[in-house]
A protein has these predicted regions:
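Hydrophobic transmembrane architecture of multi-pass small-molecule transporters
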Residues: 18, 32, 162, 389-488, ...
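Helix-loop-helix hairpins in multi-pass membrane proteins, especially solute transporters
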Residues: 17, 48-189, 205
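Central mid-sequence intracellular linker of multi-pass
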Residues: 157-199, 210-211, 216-219, 242-249, ...
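Transmembrane core module of solute transporters
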Residues: 1-52, 56-59, 64, 75, ...
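Hydrophobic alpha-helical segments of secondary membrane carriers
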Residues: 124-128, 259, 383-387
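Small-residue-rich alpha-helical segments with characteristic i,i+4
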Residues: 131-137, 141, 346-430, 484
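Symmetry-related core transmembrane helices of the 12-TM Major Facilitator Superfamily/SLC fold
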Residues: 153-168, 192-195, 220-224, 467-484
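Membrane-embedded alpha-helical segments of multi-pass transporters/permeases
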Residues: 76-80, 164-169, 229-233, 332-335, ...
């Protein structure tokens, strides 16, 4: 089951480093190709909270088998997509059909295993949940360069078949409850899909189109707001709501969801912004970027057994606090970034961030879900995982907005001091001009000015990246303010593991 979850999370990021190759292969425009990522995220974010209801209706085994088998078929369809329209449809199906695997694994770990065994299981699940987005760009870049972009999807076929078969024969610990179909809340489902889908679209596309200045962003924001109001009114009044929000009455679960949102910002934000810096400022290719990003994954592996041991010796709240400080410090060190930073300058910030992720995931999983009774865990797991995904969407939207606004600000401020009336600037331009003249280039003076403009642009980008890292660090440090509100976890009655597989 964990392997299936790994595939579903991996496919969020695996295409990110190979978008240009997919665009060329499908003859897509820049606006169209962005939907390869957006369609997957919108569809997945709708399925994640729905998975709690479906697992109670169908049983964990049947839901997971349907999800894994359908995800595998959708992956094959993506690999043979004949144009951009078919790729977008298949990616949406892949995200929706595979989305159930993620919360189902989280829920099963708390239902199947007693409290004394959950630390080791949480380490494994946390490692998979954080490793997948970390190595996604690395693996994607390698597959595309070594073979072709089609292998970004074909790689899912063999594991998908094995996972589907294994779960069908080995996982048996609950039964379907088809009585839930009576009075099924179709209106609630439609409102939830509109609410979450519109919200994800606004977050994903808003920064690129200047938010509400764009008519489609404004329209979806209005639709999402109205659908959200209708959805919450529906789930609070329906006899059998599509999503049960009563788990939020548990203080630890509510706080755990807030921490999950914060982790989503950091996890997906860092995986997005570091490769962006290496591509835009350093000019590295996808494989070189992947090698640098792999440092984080290595230290996640190293820290996994350490996190498991610490969870047995430390108060989980203290462990969470250490993780927040460590992650915040890892990204704060990136605020000193320059245009010359590469592997070794990024090594320790990446290493600290990688180690901190395991110190965050294990205690948050236990604090959020460990005190809930078994009958609430399936539904709560969907909500908990939804918050991490929404944190990622919120974080990327914030990063892209800051990148646009702060780059313009830094660029204008630098330009105020970089004028040809400045003797040092004039001397630099003269040196560039002489260099281009010696190289035999036409119009060396114009080329020299353009080179100076590029230097200003690059420095503005570096300062903007530093601003993003600072905001991310402050968010994790601010998370410490929530720590006193957490209660020490005490297993709920009947929360011990049971069943077999």
């Amino acid at each position: 089951m964990v392997v299936g979850m790994f595939m579903a999370i991996l496919d969020i990021q695996i295409v990110s480093s190979s978008i240009s190759e997919i665009q060329a292969g499908l003859a897509a425009s820049p606006d169209e190709i962005s939907w390869v990522q957006t369609a997957y995220l919108i569809a997945e974010v709708v399925m994640i909270p729905l998975s709690g209801f479906l697992s109670r209706l169908l049983s964990t085994r049947i839901l997971y088998v349907i999800s894994a088998a359908s995800f595998t078929l959708a992956s094959l369809a993506c690999a043979v997509a004949w144009n951009i329209e078919s790729m977008i449809v298949f990616r949406a199906l892949q995200g929706f059909l595979g989305g159930a695997m993620i919360p189902t694994v989280f829920a099963a770990s708390f239902i199947l295993f007693p409290p004394e065994r959950r630390a080791g299981i949480s380490v494994l699940i946390g490692l998979v949940a954080t490793m997948a987005p970390t190595i996604g760009p690395t693996l994607g870049g390698y597959l595309t360069q070594a073979f072709s972009w089609h292998w970004l999807f074909l790689i899912n076929l063999v594991p998908g078949v094995l996972v589907t078969t294994g779960v069908w024969f080995l996982v048996k610990f609950d039964k379907p409850n088809l009585e839930l179909l009576k009075g099924f809340d179709f209106a609630g489902l439609a409102l939830m899909a509109l609410f979450l889908g519109s919200l994800e679209y606004v977050f994903e596309e808003g920064p690129r189109w200047d938010w509400f200045e764009d008519q489609s962003i404004f329209t979806f924001a209005v639709i999402g707001t109205l659908a959200g109001l209708g959805f919450f009114a529906r789930v609070l009044s329906a006899r059998n709501p599509i999503v049960d929000l009563r788990a939020f009455a548990d203080r630890n679960f509510s706080l755990g969801c807030m921490f999950s949102l914060i982790i989503g910002v950091g996890l997906y934000g860092a995986v997005y912004i570091v490769p962006l810096f290496l591509a835009r400022v350093r000019g590295l290719n996808s494989l070189q970027i992947g090698e640098i990003m792999f440092v984080t994954g290595v230290f996640q592996f190293i820290s996994a057994p350490l996190a498991g041991m610490l969870s047995k010796k430390l108060d989980l709240r203290l462990m969470l606090g250490i993780g927040l400080v460590a992650f915040g410090t890892g990204v704060y060190l990136m605020t000193w970034i320059t245009a010359d930073w590469s592997f070794w300058e990024l090594f320790w910030p990446q290493a600290i961030r990688g180690m901190s992720l395991m110190l965050l995931f294990l205690p948050i999983n236990t604090l959020a879900l460990g005190t809930l009774p078994p009958d609430k865990i399936k539904n709560a797991s969907g909500l908990y995982n939804l918050m991490r995904n929404m944190g990622g969407a919120f974080g990327l939207a914030g990063i892209n907005t800051v990148m646009i606004d702060r780059a313009a600000l830094h660029g204008s401020r630098i330009a105020e001091h970089v004028t040809l009336t400045n003797p040092q600037v004039q001397a630099t331009v003269d040196n560039f001009s002489q260099m281009f003249t010696a190289a035999g280039l036409g119009n060396p003076d114009l080329a020299a000015v353009k080179m100076l403009d590029n230097m200003v642009l690059k420095q503005a980008q570096v300062l903007t990246f530093a601003d993003c890292f600072l905001l991310m660090a402050l968010l994790f440090y601010a998370g410490l303010l929530l720590m006193p509100l957490l209660r020490a976890p005490k297993p709920a009655p009947g929360s011990g593991g049971g069943g077999g597989h």
